[in-house]
Regions:
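HIT superfamily nucleotide-processing domains
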Residues: 1-132
Length: 132
């Protein structure tokens, strides 16, 4: 895609702080991080979201996170944990599939919580979802 920011980063048209790169994926620091080392992992081919990305690409990305990128973050930044998140459609600012790796530190104040008071009763939701 010509106007995709992440495609421009892959092509080298926009600078980035690369953490890891191979022929299929690129991992780089998020310029609006939630913690030190907040990294975005993207496929080098353009797919808009999880649902348009081939399973083998997703599998490769997850394996690369586990075996290549996480060890870099752990060894270089001495992280205590890792929050992994990914948005589709609503909440997805860049329409190029990407996974957020948010390093966690024992001293951080980052919380991944939502206001459950605005959510429907779990029994009502279950009734809508269960098979008849």
């Amino acid at each position: 895609m010509n106007d995709c920011l992440f495609c421009k980063i892959i092509k080298g048209e926009v600078p980035s702080y690369k953490v890891y790169e191979d022929d299929k994926v690129l991992a780089f620091l998020d310029v609006n991080p939630n913690s030190d080392g907040h990294t975005l992992v993207i496929p080098k081919e353009h797919y808009e979201n999880l649902f348009t990305t081939p399973n083998e690409v997703i599998t490769y990305m997850i394996d690369t996170i586990k075996t290549k990128i996480y060890p870099i973050l752990k060894d270089k930044l001495n992280i205590d944990g890792l929050t992994i998140c990914q948005n589709n459609f609503y909440g997805q600012d860049i329409k190029h599939y990407h996974i957020h790796l948010i390093p966690r530190y024992n001293s951080d104040k980052f919380k991944c919580t939502f206001d459950s008071s605005v959510v429907s009763d779990v029994k009502d939701v279950y009734e809508k979802l269960k098979n008849e």
